[in-house]
Amino acid sequence: MASSKKPKIAVVGATGNVGREVLDIIDEKEIQYSDLIALASSRSKGSTIDYGENKSVVVADLAEYDFSDTDIAIFSPGAKVSSEFAPKAAKQGCIVIDNTSHFRTDPDVPLVVAEVNPEALKDFRKKNIISNPNCSTMGMLVAVKPLHDHFKVKRIVVSTYQSVSGAGKEAADELFNQTKSIYANEAVVKEKFTKQIAFNVLPHIDVFLEDGQTKEEWKMYNETKKILDQNIELTATCVRVPVFISHSLAVNIEFEKPYDEDQIREIFKKSPGLKMIDYRADEGYVTPIESAGLDPVYVSRIRRDPTIPNGLNFWCVSDNLRKGAALNTVQIAEILIKDYLSS
């Protein structure tokens, strides 16, 4: 590992949506580094990525790269690539922060949301890998964690409204192209999604499991338990909607302890990573388009659920490419630099 006080940072999958966002956020946050390396497949070798205000970096080939003098590598290349290259980088002494689903269920890999469980980072040396949670889980838990600290969450029922960018650039292109085709009275082409996504909603994200859940719903259940509390029960319905950026969630919580709404609002106001906009009037809530490009998880529509004891409903929205992926990995890197690499 490099000995410089300023870390050497690599961004793997730098040409993708999340990788580019990582580069932008590193620049926005003015993170001090000795070198910043952009890595991708051999197809992109030698190409230039523009990021930040007026910076650029030349892409190197991931397969040819030696991680032994790199301090931190942020991986966003897809699970298959991470499964091959992240362990290699970790064995060479580089700390890997992985954005894919591959390591999330590994008991020896911390699954971390910066505002929720940063203390879990203490165990990263077991494999030198840290995992970033699913984007919907992350947005929800930033809002749920401070409530759990005060009232102890017993059960969560959540319905998600997830943008197409969560399925990658090809999915966003498909929504755009299908929308154009419909207006032009042309045939709709389906490639990325099994059904038309334009002007439609699909209750199907990732593969179906034997019990009828989709894997996305299973992820939310398992990741919530690993990150927050094994005793919390959760059921999810995950839906893809024809929105380009930002995921929205309708969250219903049953607490073990009683609460009043003023307490909830005060907690939300004081919690890191959250912004409450809830006026109980027209335009008094946040929508996906308003959260796009911004860091916070926004909470709105806060109200009691009168059908169960200690029940609460709220709406939360966050940019899935920023807080749901890129921002959290950079926040983790900041914690590592400050608390684990500074000595």
Over which residues does each language-model region extend?
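Glycine-rich phosphate/pyrophosphate-binding beta-alpha loops
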Residues: 239-242, 318-323
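A glycine-rich dinucleotide-binding beta-alpha-beta segment and adjacent secondary-structure elements
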Residues: 275-301
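A glycine-rich, Thr/Ser-enriched phosphate-binding loop motif common to dinucleotide/cofactor-binding enzymes
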Residues: 128-139, 212-221, 226, 324-328
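Conserved glycine-rich beta-strand-loop-beta hairpin in the small C-terminal domain of fold type I
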Residues: 245-250
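Oxyanion-binding "anion nests"
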Residues: 198-244
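A common structural junction motif
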Residues: 263, 268-278
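N-terminal Rossmann-like NAD(P) cofactor-binding subdomain of oxidoreductases
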Residues: 2-197, 233, 257, 266, ...
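Short hydrophobic/aromatic beta-strand micro-patches
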Residues: 252-254
